[in-house]
């Protein structure tokens, strides 16, 4: 609850009550020694925040949740992939956030499955700098990690697609974006498979994922 850092708490114009809070495997009244976090969430519930509770047990929050996903213990990862499957394939994710704040543009070598680095392309190149495909100029471009910017001006990094890049030893290597690899992995978990793994019905998974994705803002506590 970021409101604790503001003098006026929830009344501050800088703070917006989350429309949805996911309480993921986190029975706060029992696991937080002073239960401060629990009271914060209850305060937000009183102000309209909806709860998605993900817990095998009927916890205090699960009993009051808008959505309670009673998953099989130990299948949280599969359920998370199910959420992502819905959000990506129904385009409910924040595309601007993906573009600006993730490494989805970075290239992965098909031959090794590892991130392509500046050191792969040029002698003396940094292992900390990564490579994207500049869709505007149709060539690789280097992301300088220390400076948090591209070494070339006006780079338009491709978020999806295949490319072929020349390495410093003269060989060529096929590459694809982190985003494409990520989406491929997510698509290995369609809702039918996730429901079979977690024992949570497909409709419940989809409804909860949509509720979370369409709530602005939303948060996950785990």
Where is each model-derived feature located?
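Long, well-ordered, tryptophan-enriched scaffold segments
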Residues: 48, 62-63, 67-213
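Extended redox/cofactor-interaction regions of prokaryotic respiratory oxidoreductases
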Residues: 1-42, 47-52, 78, 156-185, ...
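Short beta-strand/turn micro-motifs composed of small residues
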Residues: 25, 55, 222
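Short, well-ordered, mixed-charge alpha-helical segments that flank or form enzyme active sites
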Residues: 30-31, 60-62
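Short, polar loop motifs at secondary-structure junctions
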Residues: 54-60
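Flexible, active-site-proximal loop/turn residues at the rims of small-molecule/cofactor binding pockets
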Residues: 27-28, 57, 74
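Short, well-ordered beta-strand core segments
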Residues: 21, 51, 68-70, 218
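Glycine-rich, aromatic-lined ligand/substrate-binding cores of catalytic
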Residues: 211-222
């Amino acid at each position: 609850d970021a409101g604790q850092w503001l003098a006026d708490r929830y009344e501050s114009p800088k703070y917006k009550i989350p429309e949805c809070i996911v309480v993921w495997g986190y029975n706060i009244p029992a696991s937080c020694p002073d239960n401060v976090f629990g009271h914060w969430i209850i305060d937000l519930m009183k102000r309209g925040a909806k709860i998605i509770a993900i817990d095998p047990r009927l916890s205090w929050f699960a009993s009051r949740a808008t959505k309670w996903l009673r998953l099989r213990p130990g299948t949280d990862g599969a359920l998370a992939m199910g959420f992502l499957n819905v959000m990506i394939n129904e385009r409910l994710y924040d595309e601007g956030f993906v573009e600006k704040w993730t490494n989805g543009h970075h290239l992965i070598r098909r031959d090794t499955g590892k991130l392509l680095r500046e050191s792969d392309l040029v002698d003396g190149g940094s292992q900390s700098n990564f490579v994207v495909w500049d869709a505007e100029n149709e060539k690789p471009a280097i992301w300088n990690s220390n400076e948090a910017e591209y070494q070339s001006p006006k780079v338009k990094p491709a978020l999806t697609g295949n490319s072929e890049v020349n390495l410093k030893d003269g060989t060529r290597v096929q590459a694809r974006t982190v985003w494409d690899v990520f989406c491929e992995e997510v698509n290995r978990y369609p809702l039918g498979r996730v429901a079979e793994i977690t024992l949570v019905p497909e409709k419940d998974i989809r409804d909860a994922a949509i509720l979370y994705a369409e709530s602005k803002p939303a948060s996950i506590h785990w």
